[in-house]
Amino acid sequence: MEMQHLLVVGVVTLAGFMRGITGFGGAALMAPVLSAMLGPVQAVVTALTLETAAALIMFPDAWPRFNRRVLLYLTIPACVTVPIGGYLLVNVDAFIMRKVIAGVVVVFALALFSGLRYSRAPRPATSLALGGIVGVLLGATSVGAPPVILYLLASSDSHTVIRANLTVFVTAISVIGLIMLSAIGAITVPVAADAGVAVIPFLIATWLGGKLFGKMNELVARRTALSLMLFMGVIGLLV
C-alpha cells in the first residue's frame, strides 16, 4: 500500500508539472495509471479534483486572456452532456472503463503527435457539437482537453490565448463533472479524502511548471508532454 501511495504521488506530481508548463495534459497523463491502480471512478474523481484545484494557480492569469466567444459555445453543451459520461463511468464494467480511459489517451496523444488538427476556423455549430462530445468524454474518462486542443489549434489565437482557453474550459467542465459525480453518489468520503491527499503535490508541481512556461522551448515542452501521455496510456492498456 505504501508503494502504491508513492506511485500515485509520483504520477500526480509529474502530471501537475507538465500541466503547469503546457496548460493541458494533467488528466490525460495521470488518468490511465491511476485507473489501473485505484479503479476508474477514483481515477476520474482524483483527476477532476486536481484539474479544478489547478485553477487556484492558473485561472487568474488565464481569465483576462481567453476567447470568450469560442469558449461559450464549447462550454455550455459540454456541461449539459457531462452527466452522460458520468453514467457510463459508474455503470460500465470497471475493467472496460480502464481500457477505454487508456485508449482515449493513446488515440489523442497520437493525433496530437501527428500534427492533426481541425482545418477550419472554429464556428458556433462545430463548437456546440464538439462541446457535447467532450462533455461525455470528460464525465466518463476525465480526459476532455485533447479534442479541444485539436480544434483550437485551427484558430488564429496565439499560444498564450489557446493555453488560457484550455485552462478556463477544463476548469469549468471539471467543476461541473465533480458536481455531477457527487450528485449520483460516486464521491464518497474515502474517495474524496484520497483525492484530497493528492492536491498539495499537484498544486506545487503545477506552480513550478507554470514558472517555466515561456522559458522552455514550446515544441520541446509539447512533445515531452505528449510522449508522457502516450507512455501512460500504453501502460494503462497493458496492465
Predicted regions located by residue number:
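Hydrophobic alpha-helical transmembrane segments of multi-pass integral membrane proteins
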Residues: 123-143
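Alpha-helical transmembrane segments
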Residues: 6, 46, 97-103, 220, ...
